[in-house]
Curated annotation (Swiss-Prot):
Record keywords, A-Z: Dioxygenase, Iron, Metal-binding, Oxidoreductase, Phenylalanine catabolism, Tyrosine catabolism
Protein EC: 1.13.11.5
Pathway: Amino-acid degradation; L-phenylalanine degradation; acetoacetate and fumarate from L-phenylalanine: step 4/6
Name of protein: Homogentisate 1,2-dioxygenase
Chain residues that bind Fe cation: 349, 355, 385
GO BP terms: L-phenylalanine catabolic process; tyrosine catabolic process
Domain of life of the native organism: Bacteria
Pfam families registered for this protein in UniProt: HgmA_C (PF04209), HgmA_N (PF20510)
The keyword Iron belongs to this UniProt entry's keyword annotation: yes
Gene behind the chain: hmgA
Quaternary structure, from the entry: Hexamer; dimer of trimers.
Amino acid sequence: MLEKAERQRKAAPDQQRSAGYMPGFGNDFETESLPGSLPQGQNSPQKCNYGLYAEQLSGSPFTAPRGTNERSWLYRIRPSVRHTGRFTKIDYPHWKTAPHTPEHSLALGQLRWSPLPAPSQSLTFLQGIRTMTTAGDALTQVGMAAHAYAFNADMVDDYFFNADGELLIVPETGAFQVFTELGRIDVEPSEICLVPRGMMFKVTRLGDEKVWRGYICENYGAKFTLPDRGPIGANCLANPRDFKTPVAAYEDKETPCRVQVKWCGSFHTAEIAHSPLDVVAWHGNYAPYKYDLKTFSPVGAILFDHPDPSIFTVLTAPSGEEGTANVDFVIFPPRWLVAEHTFRPPWYHRNIMSEFMGLIHGRYDAKEEGFVPGGMSLHNMMLAHGPDFSGFEKASNGELKPVKLDNTMAFMFETRFPQQLTTFAAELETLQDDYIDCWSGLERKFDGTPGIK
């Protein structure tokens, strides 16, 4: 799909350099789109080559420990003070921010939705975002929000940055380009893209689809990082070399543009006369990236039992409590099931964490019916969940030969905070009223006598 989209896309003359990438996670990168535009040996020369301005973008306090200290130096056509102006407030009524506890009539329970309907009008990426849940408090930089999006139009002269958190974008249908201040990222389903807090970007479509649809985790807290592997060792899971950060690219155009900002849950816009994506060169470790979920190397039980789903963690955003995430991004990818004498699907569970799930393609092994690509489910803290009746029967009675679980890619945003449902999610027409019935066939088998029932 992406190859076709690349052939169809024609770069405008004012857009320098197409998408290219540097491998690694958390590296101190350096890249320039014009030769000699990146200063050597210092960060802030008295005068920069090409008449550029030097500017630092900090993603952490100056005094953060070296391992978590993040900043990038940008060399740009105009400083960022020229990329904003007199702001006026605007509204994106479907994008909500924690704390958000609206009144709605939907009772507590396990919930599942079919995909968002395709837009009936022209919507850009920003206009197509719909908040499903919020958790924590963006003002104190803890928690997250789970969004779904569906759009069908490009952000041509519109640009955006989010001061409230970083955005982890998970496409389900349709490839698109995220053009950030630091470069271009082409992303397609089965890939993810992360845009750091405060970084300007716009989204344009690639390919030919009726709708571009997917999911977003807005992380208010500490940034996503790779989980510790512990006794797994130095390899497997998400390997650092498979993360791709874009090379420098800039957009040099003089035309009326709009910069939109999300700040403490409110939205603001300013009119400017040029593109703000004007970084010609940069170096540092505060940068966007993408990752191909197909490169995740899963580990699992190779004799018996089903391990905890934490073994499928791609990225984790830590909290102040050791071993407890502000939010985890977990996937359930293709893998071999080989455990003996074992109920192989995920087991029945009640959990202190709250789980928002989506399906990128294929089927999810614990629920083969009703949970479709583009769909969503929510199992809040301490609400029981697990395989549906048909999944239980199939796994309980099937032959335990090695089976490859293929054509599947589900994911989960899991947070330590309860996820508060938005009114939009509670009243969404695709809410499956009969979801709770998927467990109704699980009847009592116990009769007080020993033996397998």
